[in-house]
């Protein structure tokens, strides 16, 4: 009997002990979880900030340190693998300009654009292209080539074209971006306080969108854009932030998203106000300084600075060639740069000049909804350069390259060479067409030559730093109008459209009359002001608005190109071309 009672007692004690262990374990587990879940609000900036960091330039090269002979160290993405022909693949597109929103917004609001507002590669990225039949390959990049003879709609002369189809062999299901070290460099200068639809340097008298109309400012959209970008980051991504006006400020040190009180950080960002001058050099340098050796040596991460600005630097280094050196220096260290341009007065000329660098790209935005769409479709692609330093060597007795359209390095492409700084991944649609997936070459047929053979040799560097090359032979033996596929036809249509618009801008710029003259950097200037006076008032990168102007001669040209686009829209069955037709209609009725 005693033994039975002892056994029961022991059983009760054991049960109590087990329950106690469970309770204690549960307590400590929850305690640890609570500690783990504690988030850090590491925001450093205040709108009353006084500890500015200035960067002054005592020479044309500035004080920014440009490393010599450095190279980026790229690591491979083990998640990426090559596809079989039966599975859809990721497309490829050129870096640099990724849309033409600034051009469209200027026309929409009745302003005269500058030529860099519309780019070939930016417009191509608004459309999907059939890239042509590609050869069997397991290489990361697999080019395809398509040919066409097309009659010019204005001159009626036959023109010869070839597209380079930008194909990858990465499966859509296997594509995954690397973890990111992202530093946002935010422009908080006074010009960011103006309305999205107005030009800051017009002044109050010319500003057609007054504060009383309560239009959203560039600063408000920029703040919202940062928060939208944060939403795209994962817990194992890192994020930091710098702000600049006439000086530079630390907004937030680089830290893991998972350790950060994101709600608090977002609230701080929405409180940011615009003020002061625009010292891009100071902001970019301070943003670069956040990438210490520990970050740069962590090969699980890619590194990127994202600059959000209206691109009108007027303090520190303002020369575009010198600013370009800073972007190139970072690229050589494996720190790549993206630009997000805000406002109708976003200076595309500045960004177009400094973004044609390995790993760089830029977008212009005009609304929160538009940027949200860009991020949802493109964020993983915009931070993942795949192909660098692409060279195409074109050898033919019968043809030579006359012009290259749609690269981020057009100034280095001519004769027998086509160059591209960077290819980024791009989406494909249900028809296996690739977004922005071509480069168009206009060819010149040599006189008295009957040899139609063309040898095309491609070389490039992948993100691991490995060099690749391949070669193909093709024949161009057609004499009458034809298009090998819809991709090359669409590329020709869009190129002729851009050519007409750029020609119009240059024509109006050179057409000085009694009413106005047009300056290359400033735009249309009323003749009440002398050119030297305007240059003294405005900095080299500051834009004033210009009323939309179309001469009768170009209205007739626009009618012809509009009719051409309407016909090609039907042939291509692409209703997206309606946006270009509508824009031409506005210009015709201007």
Cite the ranges covered by each PLM segment:
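Low-complexity, intrinsically disordered segments enriched in Ser/Thr together with acidic residues
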Residues: 432-449
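Polar, glycine-rich mid-to-C-terminal structural blocks
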Residues: 336, 358-366, 372-377, 383-430, ...
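Exposed acidic/Ser/Thr-rich ligand/metal-binding surfaces
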Residues: 21, 152-388, 446-449, 580-590
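N-terminal Lys/Arg-rich, disordered targeting/topogenic segments
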Residues: 1-5
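Solvent-exposed residues in well-ordered beta-strands and their adjoining turns
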Residues: 167-169, 395-397, 444-446, 461
């Amino acid at each position: 009997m005693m033994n039975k009672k002892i056994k029961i007692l022991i059983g009760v004690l054991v049960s109590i002990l087990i329950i106690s262990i469970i309770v204690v374990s549960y307590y400590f587990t929850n305690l640890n979880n609570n500690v783990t879940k504690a988030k850090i609000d590491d925001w450093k900036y205040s709108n009353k900030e006084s500890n500015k960091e200035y960067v002054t330039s005592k020479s044309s090269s500035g004080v920014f340190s440009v490393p010599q002979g450095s190279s980026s160290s790229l690591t491979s993405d083990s998640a990426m693998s090559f596809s079989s022909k039966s599975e859809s693949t990721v497309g490829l597109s050129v870096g640099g300009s990724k849309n033409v929103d600034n051009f469209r917004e200027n026309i929409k609001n009745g302003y005269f654009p500058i030529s860099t507002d519309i780019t070939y590669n930016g417009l191509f990225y608004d459309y999907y292209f059939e890239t042509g039949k590609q050869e069997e390959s397991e290489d990361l990049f697999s080019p395809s080539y398509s040919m066409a003879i097309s009659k010019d709609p204005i001159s009626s002369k036959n023109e010869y074209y070839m597209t380079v189809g930008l194909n990858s062999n990465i499966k859509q299901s296997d594509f995954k971006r690397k973890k990111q070290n992202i530093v946002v460099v935010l422009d908080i200068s006074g010009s960011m306080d103006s309305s999205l639809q107005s030009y800051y340097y017009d002044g109050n008298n010319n500003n057609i969108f007054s504060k009383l109309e309560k239009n959203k400012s560039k600063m408000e959209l920029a703040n919202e854009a940062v928060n939208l970008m944060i939403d795209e980051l994962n817990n194992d991504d890192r994020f930091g932030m710098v702000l600049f006006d006439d000086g530079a400020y630390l907004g937030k040190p680089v830290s893991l998203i998972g350790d950060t009180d994101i709600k608090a950080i977002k609230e701080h960002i929405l409180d940011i106000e615009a003020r002061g001058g625009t010292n891009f050099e100071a902001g970019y340098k301070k943003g670069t300084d956040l990438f210490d050796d520990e970050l740069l040596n962590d090969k699980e991460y890619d590194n990127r600075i994202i600059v959000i600005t209206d691109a009108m630097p007027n303090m520190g280094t303002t020369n575009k060639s010198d600013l370009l050196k800073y972007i190139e220096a970072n690229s050589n260290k494996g720190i790549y740069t993206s630009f997000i341009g805000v406002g109708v007065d976003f200076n595309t000329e500045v960004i177009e000049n400094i973004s044609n660098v390995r790993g760089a790209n830029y977008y212009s935005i005009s609304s929160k909804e538009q940027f949200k769409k860009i991020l949802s479709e493109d964020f993983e692609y915009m931070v993942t350069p795949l192909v660098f330093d692409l060279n195409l060597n074109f050898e033919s007795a019968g043809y030579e390259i006359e012009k290259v359209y749609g690269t981020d390095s057009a100034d280095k492409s001519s004769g027998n060479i086509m160059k591209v700084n960077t290819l980024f991944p791009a989406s494909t649609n249900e028809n296996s067409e690739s977004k922005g997936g071509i480069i168009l070459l206009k060819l010149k047929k040599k006189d008295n030559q009957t040899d139609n053979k063309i040898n095309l040799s491609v070389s490039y560097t992948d993100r691991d730093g490995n060099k690749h090359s391949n070669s193909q032979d093709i024949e161009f033996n057609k004499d009458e109008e034809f298009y090998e596929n819809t991709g090359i036809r669409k590329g020709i249509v869009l190129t002729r459209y851009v050519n007409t618009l750029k020609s119009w801008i240059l024509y109006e710029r050179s057409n000085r009359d009694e009413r106005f003259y047009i300056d290359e950097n400033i735009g249309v200037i009323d003749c009440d002001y002398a050119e030297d006076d305007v240059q003294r008032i405005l900095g080299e990168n500051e834009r004033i608005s210009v009323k939309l102007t179309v001469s009768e001669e170009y209205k007739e040209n626009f009618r012809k190109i509009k009719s051409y686009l309407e016909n090609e829209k039907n042939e291509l069955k692409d209703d997206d071309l309606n946006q270009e037709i509508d824009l031409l209609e506005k210009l015709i009725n201007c």
